[in-house]
From Swiss-Prot:
Organism field: Bacillus cereus (strain Q1)
Top-rank taxon: Bacteria
GO MF annotation, one: ligase activity
Keywords, comma-separated and alphabetical: Coiled coil, Ligase
InterPro entries assigned: Bacillithiol_biosynth_BshC (IPR011199), CC_BshC (IPR055399), Rossmann-like_BshC (IPR055398)
Organism placement in taxonomy: Bacteria, Bacillati, Bacillota, Bacilli, Bacillales
Similarity-based family: Belongs to the BshC family.
Protein name (record): Putative cysteine ligase BshC
EC number(s) given by UniProt: 6.-.-.-
Gene name, Swiss-Prot/TrEMBL: bshC
Residues forming coiled coils: 460-485
Amino acid sequence: MEIKEISVPQQGVVADYMNGEKEIQSCFDYMLTEDAFKQRVQDLREREFFRQDLVAHLLEYNTKLQAGEATIQNVKALEDEDTYVVIAGQQAGLLTGPLYTIHKIISVLQLAKEKEESLGVKVVPVFWIAGEDHDMDEINHTFVTKNKKIKKTIFHDRNPKKASASESELSLEDCRKWIEEIFKTYPETNFTKDVLRFIDDSLGKSNTYVDFFGHLIMKMFINSGLILVDSHHPELRKLEVPFFKQIVSKYKEVQEGLHNQQEVIKELGYKPIIETKSNAVHIFMEIDNERVLLEDNQGKFVGKDGTYSFSYEELIEEMERSPERFSNNVVTRPLMQEYVFPTLAFIGGPGELAYWSELQQVFHTIGFRMPPVVPRITITYIERDIATDLHDLQLQESDPFLNNVDKLRENWLSNQIEEPIDERFVEAKKEIIDIHKSLQQFVKKIDPGLSSFAGKNEFKINEQIELLERMLKRNIEKKHEVELNKFRRIQFAIRPLGAPQERVWNVCYYLNQFGLDFVDRVMEKPFSWNGKHHVIKL
């Protein structure tokens, strides 16, 4: 594996944050400097965490996932007042979801290791599985290449019900068939059987989406020391009750903090991305197997436009009786994370970084400071055949990242032709139509009754010219079919569906191609935190 860094243009909050723009950095409580991390450690030392209860839960949960010894030791280390976490989170995508989930975890592991060495304190890696998510459409699919097209392959569970990812039971038989269909689209390699066994072993131990995700991730990172947490685990929810109560008692201040911070963001020229009603309480409650967002209505806490209604006392009572019914929204999830874990740093993708910039005053309302927010490592893998295609087309490795691949294809094709086709046909059409317009005037003068037919005649001639143009272009493309297929392969591999590779393709393809130790070998590479994109040649 060879690693190379390239600069890929970013936009908005992420670009300005990485470029060190003071205005947007003022929306975060810590800059990404070593001094800021030292200050963060000092700030965390002044806070209290329910470490023993948390460790007891994490030991039980990670042991059930058959965690390695390094993970167990890291969990136990959290009992120590001078142990901190680097944390990130993601939904429980089937087969772990898009590659960026793996890249987030690699980011967490690397930053935890680096900060432990540089700060001289114990830092452990934590990955937060968003088990409360009810949006199965976000996690129930993967993308494959089939018949030279990119296809979205959806897992259709035979027993679908509106439940969270932590509670949605998987039909193992259906899931096995779905996995088989996916692997049929991959080339069979020396690793295929091992990878399928690896996946099936995790599936066989799982009842829910979160179980399957947790077992797969734990097996993939078995020796890394990674700690997993299911954000919707009933035992964790019990530990969170005091903070849920605090949010309910301060929901107006939370909403005001969000509104004020979004005004700051607007003044800086950015568009806020968090959308909430002014009466939002920022907590979901599970009612009749549905996740209902609570809102304030004249002192009552209501859901679904008043279909459900609770007094403050009733809500608090329900939190104490059934904490597993409650979960956070996009605004309060980061706050709950801050309450539960002694967070040295949070690692997020571009979207997360943008919405965290809207939360500073929300954190302050609760009496917290935002942890350092570190953009995750971004990676693209280039296989040998794709590197060969790039070389054959005389393209740089950075070209598909800096330019639209379709545009690169068009430019290449136009360079193979002496005269530009589009311009020549535009000229020809103009000349022919000019002559025909003159002819139409002549016909109209002699026989006005033929005016309509003359107009149709012009349309037919135009159609024939366009047909000729299409046939010429088709023949040229056929002549250069080999090269144009290289562009298609590059597009599919590096910019599938016009998106970054890590947002579309799944890690299982790479495990199948390169073996079960693929992720371990990627983790051995040195990644930088300078905002550049990492290209790994395989």
